[in-house]
């Protein structure tokens, strides 16, 4: 079964997006506690976007909701090391 040019382009774009997302997830998992500036509790990383943004942080700052094994709670981690 031959694919059309449109299907090939769509497949290539999908593959590229999936690959880049997986790379970002791997980098997020490598963030250590010493690389974070903590900004309160959270339920998901979406909550941390506003807490880790301007004016206090640059646009390159990533807000992650990370589990703290000492307190058994999730906290916002603001980091530029990703």
Swiss-Prot record:
GO biological process, alphabetically ordered: defense response to fungus; killing of cells of another organism
Entry keyword set: Antimicrobial, Disulfide bond, Fungicide, Plant defense, Secreted, Signal
Pfam families linked: AtDEF-like
Keyword Transport on entry: no
Residues in the signal sequence: 1-23
Superkingdom per UniProt: Eukaryota
Main localization category: secreted
Cystine connections: 36-78, 42-65, 48-76, 52-77
GO terms for cellular component: extracellular region
Subcellular location: Secreted
Family recorded in the similarity comment: Belongs to the DEFL family.
Name listed for the protein in its UniProt record: Defensin-like protein 275
Organism: Arabidopsis thaliana
């Amino acid at each position: 079964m031959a694919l059309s040019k449109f299907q090939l382009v769509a497949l290539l774009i999908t593959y590229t997006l999936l690959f880049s997302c997986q790379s970002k997830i791997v980098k997020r998992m490598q963030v250590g506690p010493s690389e974070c500036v903590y900004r309160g509790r959270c339920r998901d990383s979406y909550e941390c976007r506003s807490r880790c943004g301007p004016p206090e942080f640059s646009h390159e700052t990533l807000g992650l909701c990370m589990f703290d094994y000492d307190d058994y709670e999730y906290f916002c981690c603001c980091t530029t090391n990703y």
